From Swiss-Prot:
InterPro entries: OGF_rcpt, OGFr. Residues 327-342, 452-464 have a biased composition (Polar residues). Signal peptide: none annotated. This is Opioid growth factor receptor-like protein 1. GO terms for molecular function: opioid growth factor receptor activity. Coiled coil: none annotated. Residues 43-59, 316-325, 363-382, 390-400, 425-439 have a biased composition (Basic and acidic residues). It comes from Mus musculus. Residues 74-86 have a biased composition (Low complexity). One of its GO terms (cellular component) is membrane. It holds the Pfam family OGFr_N. Residues 1-91, 309-464 are annotated as: Disordered. Belongs to the opioid growth factor receptor family.
Length: 464
């Protein structure tokens, strides 16, 4: 199988998005998807559309890039600075995303180059060989190193043996796991028992204890002292990443989520280990193979992350451009119609249609008198001598005479400007249209007719 894979070239992921399918089928809500909840069996369902990695080197052995490991410590240091300043926005690490992409996909193009009868990791856990270069057996580590926090802190060669992976670590004496060795390890009760004891020992070193067989964890009795140490020793974040990976390789995928959830709670809610939150979100969460579990953890983290605008691990906002477009579309016509409406109102306030004056000249006149600004009559003189002092009683007579003497065809309202002749009082409120009346011959004839009627019915008005 390894030889077949070795001859196939796959497209290498080039961005964080290529490596991360957490929100691939879910942008906001949490759908219930059928499939396994974790473990290596669920890995094919996890990220089926993601590109795969080409061979790391000629022999086909997956190479553990030192960049992600260095970046893990750097990320922890940056997170420590952020916890004090609170202003720096974190960034997704492509190196971390690619490293964990390979892990979740069980190392594309992985090719075992060790003989199946080597089984160095299994033999170490069966207490048959010591780990190198120290020469210490697993039973001694579990019995004598337990609780010796100075030794566990400063020795950097045992962790690769206690939690083996299918990638090379910093201890080149440690051997990578093989697929055959993984299957044999899972079937060996002695090895599994010691592996769980090693896990408990390291949890206690971090101030955590395993409370049941399902992987649930809680604070240990020494949690305050150990959390303070964990918050200040970022290189232990890399150890936690290795432990989580190894749990998944050796059949304990279900133990990951409880531990990661506990760490996120302590970092984001209790604020006991705030410096770890960057590594927890960038590394620990993404060791989990099931997308649904990752989404649950990230939603929990997003709920408690501060400042909330700096949370960069949430679902992509794919609908955002459509929303902004939908908001802009009704805004433009609304503003345009408002502008037209206001212009229309101004024209109606300044001009009275002939049809409206024919129906109710008095009511229109009162409205015009109310809307007329102070000083309007002084600024806009009337062309008629007697129009500057209108009398309501004469105006009513003029309107009545106008209604009785007007030809039938002029009683029809005409919006085109060919309607009734406005009365002299209405002309007082039509300062801006008086010039138009003088230019219109029909309006000029109407003026003459109105003046003649006024002289005949009320001589005082023409002489005043």
């Amino acid at each position: 199988m390894g030889n077949l894979l070795g001859g196939v070239s796959f497209r290498e992921p080039t961005t964080v998005e290529d490596c991360d399918s957490t929100w691939q089928t879910d942008s906001e809500p949490e759908p219930e998807q059928p499939g396994p909840a974790g473990g290596g069996e669920g890995q094919q369902h996890d990220e089926p559309e993601q590109p795969k990695q080409p061979p790391e080197r000629a022999g086909g052995r997956p190479r553990a890039s030192p960049v992600p490991e260095d970046h893990a410590e750097a990320a922890g240091a940056e997170q420590g600075g952020e916890s004090t300043e609170g202003n720096a926005k974190p960034k997704r690490s492509f190196y971390a995303a690619r490293d964990l992409y390979k892990y979740r996909h069980q190392y594309p193009n992985f090719k075992d180059i060790r003989y199946q009868n080597d089984l160095s990791n299994l033999r170490f856990y069966k207490n048959k060989i010591p780990f190198k270069p120290d020469g210490v057996y697993i039973e001694e580590v579990l019995n004598k190193w337990k609780g010796d926090y100075e030794k566990l802190e400063h020795n950097h060669t045992y962790i690769q043996w206690l939690f083996p992976l299918r990638e090379q670590g910093l201890n080149f004496y440690a051997k990578e796991l093989t697929t055959y060795e993984i299957e044999e390890f899972k079937k060996t009760k002695e090895a599994i028992r010691r592996f769980l004891l090693a896990y408990k020992m390291m949890l206690e070193f971090f101030g955590i204890k395993l409370i049941d067989k399902t992987g649930n964890v809680a604070r240990a009795g020494n949690w305050q002292e150990r959390f303070q140490h964990l918050n200040e020793s970022q290189h232990n974040y890399l150890r936690i990443t290795r432990i989580l990976k190894s749990l998944g390789e050796l059949g304990y995928e279900s133990f990951k989520s409880p531990l990661v959830k506990f760490i996120l709670h302590e970092a984001l809610v209790e604020n006991t280990i705030p410096n770890i939150k960057q590594s927890a979100l960038e590394y620990f969460v993404y060791t989990i193979r099931d997308r649904r579990e990752r989404r649950k953890l990230l939603r929990f983290a997003q709920k408690h992350y501060t400042p909330s605008e700096n949370f960069i691990w949430g679902p992509p906002k794919k609908e955002l451009p459509e929303r902004s477009k939908a908001q802009k579309t009704p805004t433009l016509p609304a503003s345009g119609s408002n502008g037209q409406t206001s212009t229309h109102k101004k024209s109606k306030d300044s001009k009275i249609s002939p049809g409206a004056s024919h129906v109710n000249s008095k009511s229109v006149e009162e409205k015009k008198g109310a809307s007329r600004e102070p000083g309007e009559e002084a600024d806009k003189p009337s062309p008629e001598p007697g129009s500057g002092d209108p009398k309501p009683r004469n105006t009513e007579k003029d309107s009545a005479a106008d209604q009785s003497d007007s030809p039938p065809e002029k009683t029809v309202p005409d919006t085109a400007g060919k309607g009734e002749c406005p009365t002299s009082s209405e002309k007082d409120g039509e300062g801006e249209d008086q010039s138009k009346d003088s230019e219109n011959p029909e309006n000029a004839g109407c003026h003459a007719e109105v003046v003649a009627q006024q002289n005949a019915t009320n001589p005082q008005t023409s002489s005043g």
